[in-house]
C-alpha cells in the first residue's frame, strides 16, 4: 500500500532529527549535511536504518537545505543532491513494509517579500526545482518542514502541488504566543495550509506553547 492509502487509517511514525545524528557521526560545524550524501553515504543510511529499526515508518531525505541558494557557486546541482539522498533513503527502506521516504524541504534561509528580499515567484521556482527532482528520483511524499513564514509556506505548497501528485505534509513552527514569524495564529495558519491542499499538517519546535493549543487544530 502507498503512503496516501495509509494516511488517516493507521498510526504512522516519522523519524527524528537527522542533523544532530550526523553530528554525532562526525559532521563538523559549518559543514553542509547534504554533502554527506556523497562523502558519507553509509553513515547517512545508518541514521535512516536506525530510525526504521526503532519503529519509524517515514524517514526524511537528507535534503533539508538542498536548494539552489545553498549551493550557489558550488560545482553541484540540486538534482544531484536530491537524487543521492533519495537513493540512500530508498536503500534503507528496501525490503521493509510500510516504510516511506519523504523528500524533506526546509526554509530557503531567506525571508520572502515584503518582509525580505526574496520574490515570491522565485521562491516557488526554487521549491519547484526540488520537488521535480524528488518526484523523478522516487520520493513517496513531500515534507515541507519547520516553516514560519506565511509567504514561504504558500510558495512551497504551490510548488509541490504544481510539480507533482505526491502527498504533501507541512509542519509549522510557532512562537510562545502561538504565532508564526510573520504573525499568523494557529487557526489562520492551519486554514491557509488546508486550503492550499496539504494532506496533513503538523507543528514542531514551538516554545512554551501548550500542546493542546496547537493539537486541537492540527
Label each residue range with its predicted role.
Residues 4-39, 64, 68-70, 97-120, ...:
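N-terminal small/glycine-rich loop or linker at the start of catalytic domains
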Residues 46-59, 137:
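Catalytic domains of carbohydrate-active enzymes, especially glycoside hydrolases
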Residues 32, 36-39, 58-78, 139-154:
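Glycine-rich, proline-tolerant flexible connector loops at the mouths of alpha/beta enzymes
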Residues 16, 51, 89, 142, ...:
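Conserved, mostly hydrophobic/aromatic
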Residues 36-50, 74-88, 121-128:
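Glycine-rich anion/phosphate-binding loops
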Residues 207-214:
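Conserved small/polar residues in nucleotide/adenosyl-binding loops
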Residues 111-113, 156-161, 165-193:
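Conserved anion-binding
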Residues 74-96, 154-170, 216:
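Alpha-helix-loop-beta-strand connector modules within alpha/beta enzyme cores
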Amino acid at each position: 500500500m502507498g503512503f496516501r492509502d495509509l494516511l488517516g487509517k493507521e498510526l504512522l511514525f516519522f523519524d527524528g532529527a537527522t542533523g544532530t545524528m550526523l553530528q554525532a557521526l562526525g559532521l563538523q560545524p559549518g559543514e553542509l549535511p547534504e554533502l554527506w550524501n556523497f562523502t558519507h553515504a553509509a553513515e547517512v543510511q545508518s541514521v535512516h536504518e536506525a530510525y526504521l529499526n526503532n519503529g519509524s515508518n517515514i524517514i526524511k531525505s537528507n535534503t533539508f537545505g538542498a536548494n539552489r541558494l545553498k549551493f550557489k557557486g558550488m560545482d553541484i546541482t540540486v538534482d544531484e543532491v536530491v537524487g543521492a539522498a533519495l537513493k540512500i533513503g530508498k536503500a534503507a527502506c528496501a525490503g521493509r513494509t510500510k516504510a516511506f521516504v519523504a523528500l524533506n524541504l526546509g526554509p530557503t534561509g531567506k525571508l520572502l517579500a515584503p518582509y525580505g528580499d526574496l520574490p515570491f515567484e522565485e521562491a516557488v521556482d526554487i521549491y519547484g526545482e526540488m520537488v521535480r527532482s524528488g518526484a523523478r528520483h522516487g520520493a513517496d511524499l513531500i515534507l515541507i518542514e519547520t516553516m514560519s513564514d506565511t509567504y514561504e509556506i504558500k510558495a512551497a505548497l504551490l510548488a509541490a502541488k504544481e510539480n507533482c501528485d505526491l502527498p504533501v505534509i507541512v509542519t509549522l513552527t510557532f512562537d510562545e504566543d502561538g504565532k508564526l514569524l510573520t504573525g499568523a495564529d494557529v487557526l489562520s495558519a492551519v486554514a491557509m495550509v488546508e486550503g492550499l491542499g496539504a494532506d496533513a499538517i503538523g507543528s514542531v519546535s514551538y516554545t512554551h506553547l501548550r500542546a493542546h493549543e496547537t493539537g486541537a487544530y492540527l
